[in-house]
């Protein structure tokens, strides 16, 4: 999408085509096979990095493509549309890459960004805790000074892909020297650091990327593990959350496209009394409605990414939340309608749609719940009184 039209630039169209052509070599069957064997999608990730797709949004001087969140979300959408959506794309290049590129020191950028860009290094993100989900002000992971070092202690939960990561960006709290009050702070923690451990959470998701509980038991970090200023971490954190929502929306749009593609192919060829079942309005209309909803969500996702890339943080926050909400709802309905349209075949492994039901449902919960988005829109967009 350019500034003057809804037509993507030739460069973006070429990128979309290149990603779609490449990821078709993997597809949903590859993704499901890896998930069911409890294996990582290492080949897919490495090749995405080698081709420049993972780091397309990161600065060129650190090995990235020098583009923006629009381009990275485009990559995410096309991968999801092929049935190979990877949560770590939301985390490593989008959240962490963005925060480090914007607020990291030169040394931090040189150390972490090239690896994130080419896929040789994966960085997880740890914010959620057992008693702190959307209410992130309840985070209890703390960082205290010990000479020039930091000592980190706490627990995190529902952390994606920590077993694939070499480092994790941890959201904790540090003690303000003058007042003793705790304030947010961001730290890069190597996953092989003494005192750092994790255990898997058994989920009903069909995904090669697993979820984990993370334990930080007095993990000692050097002074330069802190990302950004101690007194501005909340701003740094939110700089990574708009990309998170944009990428979540792009993933959901792609999932919706995938499900509709499978369903449409099926109803075009499945015949009852010599007539394709797709000729009946009882099937055609719900699928058409889902297509409309997915396309509308895609437009809002593109708007959010465009606003973000133009530096309109407030406008991007509103649009990113709306995009995430719209895409999650549209994707969930599209997957459900695909299964319904295919009948019993929609629940078989052969057609590969049923496995997406929990993933589509997850999109309505994470990275921010639909209810919290509605709270945000009610308060910020409509100016209604705060409800919590």
Curated annotation (Swiss-Prot):
Entry GO CC: cytoplasm
Which EC number(s) are documented for this chain?
A: 1.3.99.-
Enzyme class, broadest EC rank: oxidoreductase
Listed under GO biological process in this entry are:
fatty acid beta-oxidation using acyl-CoA dehydrogenase
Q: Sorted alphabetically, which keywords does the UniProt record give?
A: FAD, Flavoprotein, Oxidoreductase
Per the record, the domain of life is Bacteria
Q: Which reaction does it catalyse?
A: a 2,3-saturated acyl-CoA + A = a 2,3-dehydroacyl-CoA + AH2
Name the record gives this protein = Acyl-CoA dehydrogenase fadE12
Classification of source organism:
Bacteria, Bacillati, Actinomycetota, Actinomycetes, Mycobacteriales
Which gene is this protein's source?
fadE12
């Amino acid at each position: 999408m350019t500034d003057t039209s809804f037509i993507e630039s030739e460069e973006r169209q070429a990128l979309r085509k290149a990603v779609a052509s490449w990821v078709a070599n993997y597809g949903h069957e590859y993704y499901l096979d890896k998930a069911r064997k409890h294996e990582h999608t290492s080949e897919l990730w490495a090749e995405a990095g080698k081709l420049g797709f993972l780091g397309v949004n990161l600065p060129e001087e650190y090995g990235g493509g020098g583009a923006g969140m629009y381009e990275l979300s485009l990559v995410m959408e096309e991968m999801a549309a092929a049935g190979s959506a990877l949560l770590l794309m939301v985390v490593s290049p989008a959240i962490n890459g963005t925060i480090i590129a914007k607020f990291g020191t030169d040394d931090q950028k040189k150390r972490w960004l090239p690896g994130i860009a080419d896929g040789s290094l994966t960085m997880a993100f740890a914010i959620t805790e057992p008693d702190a989900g959307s209410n992130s002000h309840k985070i209890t992971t703390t960082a205290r000074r010990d000479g020039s070092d930091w000592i980190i202690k706490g627990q995190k939960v529902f952390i994606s892909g920590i077993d694939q990561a070499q480092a994790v960006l941890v959201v904790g709290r540090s003690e303000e020297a003058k007042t003793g009050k705790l304030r947010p702070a961001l730290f890069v923690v190597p996953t092989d650091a003494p005192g750092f451990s994790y255990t898997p959470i058994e989920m009903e998701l069909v995904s090669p990327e697993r979820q984990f509980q993370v334990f930080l038991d007095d993990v000692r970090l050097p002074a330069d593990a802190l990302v950004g200023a101690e007194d501005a971490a909340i701003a740094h954190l939110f700089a990574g959350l708009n990309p998170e929502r944009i990428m979540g929306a792009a993933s959901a749009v792609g999932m919706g496209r995938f499900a509709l593609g499978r369903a449409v192919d099926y109803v075009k060829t499945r015949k009852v009394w010599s007539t394709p079942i797709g000729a009946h309005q009882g099937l055609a209309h719900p699928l058409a409605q889902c297509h409309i909803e997915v396309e509308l969500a895609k437009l809002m996702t593109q708007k959010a990414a465009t606003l973000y890339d133009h530096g309109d943080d407030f406008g991007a926050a509103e649009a990113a939340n709306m995009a995430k909400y719209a895409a999650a709802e549209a994707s969930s309905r599209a997957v459900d309608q695909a299964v319904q349209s295919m009948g019993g075949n929609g629940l078989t492994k052969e057609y590969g749609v049923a496995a997406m039901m929990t993933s589509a449902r997850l999109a309505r919960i994470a990275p921010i719940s639909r209810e919290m988005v509605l709270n945000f829109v009610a308060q910020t967009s409509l100016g209604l009184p705060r409800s919590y």
